[in-house]
Design a protein with these regions (language model features):
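N-terminal type II signal-anchor transmembrane helix
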Residues: 1-37
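A structural signal for short, hydrophobic/glycine-enriched beta-strand patches
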Residues: 26-127
C-alpha cells in the first residue's frame, strides 16, 4: 500500500469518526426537541454543569443550558432553577458560577438553588 493510500484511508476514517457521533445525536434526538412554549410547567428546572472556562465562567454549552433555564423561568414554566455541578476543587465551582450567571441575567437570587453535593449526574437525579 502506498503512503498516499494510507493517508487517504486515515483521512476518510477520521472524517467518519468525527461526523458519526453528531449524526447519531441528531438522529436520536429527532422529535424530542421542544420549544419553550411546548414545555409543560413544572416547579423546578434542573440544570447540570457542563464546564467552566479558565476564568471560571460557564463554557458555551453550559451558557446555552442556563439561557434555556432563564427562558423557562421568564415564560413562567418553572418557579425555581436548581443548578448542579462540580465543586470538588477550591478553584473550580460550577454551582456558584451557574448561579451567578442566572442572577446576572435576571433570575432573582431566591429562585436559584445551588446543589453542592454533586458527584455525578445519576447521584443528582437520585437525590
Amino acid at each position: 500500500m502506498t503512503w498516499r493510500r494510507v493517508l487517504a484511508i486515515l483521512l476518510v476514517g477520521g472524517v467518519v469518526l468525527g461526523v458519526a457521533p453528531t449524526g447519531y445525536a441528531l438522529a436520536a434526538s429527532a422529535g424530542r426537541i421542544s420549544t419553550v412554549d411546548d414545555v409543560p410547567s413544572e416547579p423546578v428546572a434542573l440544570v447540570f454543569g457542563a464546564g467552566l472556562d479558565i476564568r471560571g465562567e460557564p463554557m458555551p454549552f453550559l451558557r446555552a443550558r442556563l439561557d434555556l433555564a432563564r427562558q423557562l423561568y421568564a415564560a413562567g414554566k418553572v418557579r425555581v432553577v436548581l443548578v448542579s455541578g462540580d465543586n470538588r476543587r477550591a478553584n473550580y465551582n460550577e454551582p456558584d458560577a451557574m448561579r451567578d450567571y442566572l442572577i446576572d441575567n435576571g433570575i432573582p437570587a431566591a429562585k436559584v438553588i445551588a446543589d453542592y453535593a454533586w458527584f455525578d449526574t445519576y447521584a443528582t437525579c437520585v437525590r
